[in-house]
């Protein structure tokens, strides 16, 4: 019987099958942890006298609470927030006590958990991957089944290397056509969520297929899968291919020699079989897309960059009209208003959605030789120390600095308004991150989600700007 990519991975990881009364028990290949969602899990292990079942299949990094302030003269990244410092110390102690490898603050491998997994070669096709973070779906770009879990589940995986789960349904998200200049992977996923809604994927795993998806680089595929959760899905996946294998080859934790050949042979069996049936299929024509931007307080409130905010009369029901009214009151925007020309106070280039080297190259290519507008604060936060090192080797940091932007250390940063990486109350931020909820980037912050190209164009002009004028 033909099977989907999801079916193949799920079926090979079942420890105990799902029944009418009980969920399935799944084996977990890779467990990633960080300082925010793991402390209570370790407390539970100590309370029950349990060990970590597979410390060799567990990896920790510091990312959420880490300051991104440039290093001091001593080369140390200063941690001034007491709560952040306590979380970082606790993770360090927990990893030492339980024998878990840690990429600590200041180390050359530290970074956002969903950036370092792929760049180190830990993320591989066919794996089950979990982390106490909703954007674990990022790793699905490699043909892995990857999803976020809660703190109690973190404890369960630490103790057993297994997880209790109900089998989700499958949804094909087919994207055909070719992207036009100035339109990016970020615009694809924002368009999908805007068209189908933040609840479209509830109870499903997305598998992205089609000509436009196959043409994307691995880092672009990660951007797509990263925001699957914003579309309501449990996870997002893309079948592995030669692009995937070329990205993984030679990375520190990738298979070597004969093991590599065996791995690739297995990975080639994973793509969805001809004739396999998805529970649902939705489509998008990439050739018709323009740059996208959000206007409201959930990622589904998005419009083309040259569009207008919808009016209540255009919405299908009273609930949608009420949500629009509430969002626009928070954002201080009006129905029918265009966003082009809307004043911008902060631009954030970073997050697990868009902080990889290709994102920084894309932004720097537009910013080179230009200045950001007076009064705009632009924060550029690489996703990992490895990304930062590569960007500096290419001179990208100089381009950002000379334009007037801040070049910061690696971490989650302004995505969730940590430390001093916040958007002031009432101010507008064009952000390459994944969430625009009320207060997400700081109390009263007003977030407009967009691609790196749109973010940089807006930084240059000081207002929401169409990036297509800056690209060939």
UniProtKB/Swiss-Prot annotation:
Binds 1 [4Fe-4S] cluster per subunit. It catalyses: (2R,3S)-3-isopropylmalate = (2S)-2-isopropylmalate. [4Fe-4S] cluster binds at residues 352, 412, 415. It is an enzyme of class 4 (lyase). InterPro entries: 3-IsopropMal_deHydase_lsu (IPR004430), Acnase/IPM_dHydase_lsu_aba_1/3 (IPR015931), Acoase/IPM_deHydtase_lsu_aba (IPR001030), Aconitase_4Fe-4S_BS (IPR018136), Aconitase_4Fe-4S_dom (IPR036008), IPM_dehydratase_rel_enz (IPR050067), IPMI_cat (IPR033941). Catalyzes the isomerization between 2-isopropylmalate and 3-isopropylmalate, via the formation of 2-isopropylmaleate. This is 3-isopropylmalate dehydratase large subunit. It comes from Roseiflexus castenholzii (strain DSM 13941 / HLO8). The gene is leuC.
């Amino acid at each position: 019987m033909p099977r989907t990519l999801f079916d193949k991975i799920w079926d090979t990881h079942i420890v105990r099958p799902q029944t009418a009364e009980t969920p399935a028990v799944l084996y977990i290949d890779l467990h990633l942890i960080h300082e925010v969602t793991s402390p209570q899990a370790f407390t539970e292990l100590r309370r029950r006298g349990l060990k970590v079942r597979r410390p060799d299949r567990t990896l920790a990094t510091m990312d959420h609470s880490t300051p991104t302030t440039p290093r001091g003269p001593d080369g140390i990244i200063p941690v001034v927030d007491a709560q952040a410092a306590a979380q970082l110390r606790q993770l360090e102690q927990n990893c030492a006590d339980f024998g878990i490898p840690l990429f600590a603050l200041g180390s050359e491998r530290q970074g956002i958990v969903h950036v370092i997994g792929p760049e180190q070669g830990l993320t591989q096709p066919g794996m089950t991957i979990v982390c106490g973070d909703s954007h674990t779906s990022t790793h699905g770009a490699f043909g892995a089944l990857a999803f976020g879990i809660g703190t109690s589940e973190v404890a369960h995986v630490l103790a057993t290397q297994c997880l209790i789960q109900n089998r989700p349904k499958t949804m094909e998200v087919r994207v055909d056509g070719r992207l036009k200049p100035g339109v990016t992977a970020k615009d694809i996923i924002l368009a999908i969520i805007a068209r189908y809604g933040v609840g479209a994927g509830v109870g499903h795993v997305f598998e992205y297929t089609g000509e436009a998806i196959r043409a994307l680089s691995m880092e672009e595929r990660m951007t797509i899968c990263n925001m699957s959760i914003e579309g309501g899905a449990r996870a997002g996946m893309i079948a592995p291919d030669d692009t995937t294998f070329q990205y993984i080859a030679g990375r520190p934790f990738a298979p070597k020699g004969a093991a590599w050949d065996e791995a690739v042979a297995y990975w080639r069996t994973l793509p969805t079989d001809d004739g396999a049936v998805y529970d649902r299929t939705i489509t998008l024509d990439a050739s018709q897309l323009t740059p996208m931007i959000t206007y409201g307080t959930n990622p589904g409130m998005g419009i083309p960059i040259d569009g207008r905010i919808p009016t209540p009369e255009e919405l299908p029901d009273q609930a949608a009209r009420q949500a629009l009214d509430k969002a626009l009151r928070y954002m201080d925007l009006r129905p029918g208003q265009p966003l082009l020309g809307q004043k911008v106070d902060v631009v954030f280039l970073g997050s697990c959605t868009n902080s990889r080297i290709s994102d920084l190259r894309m932004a720097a290519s537009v910013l080179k030789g230009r200045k950001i507008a007076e009064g705009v604060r632009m924060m550029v936060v690489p996703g990992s120390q490895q990304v930062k090192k590569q960007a500096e080797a290419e001179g990208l940091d100089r381009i950002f600095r000379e334009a007037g932007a801040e070049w910061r250390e690696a971490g989650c940063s302004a995505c969730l308004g940590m430390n001093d990486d916040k958007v002031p109350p009432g101010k507008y931020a064009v952000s390459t991150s994944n969430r625009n909820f009320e207060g997400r980037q700081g109390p009263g912050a007003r977030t407009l989600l967009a691609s790196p190209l749109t973010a940089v164009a807006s930084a240059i002009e000081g207002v929401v700007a169409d990036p297509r004028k800056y690209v060939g």
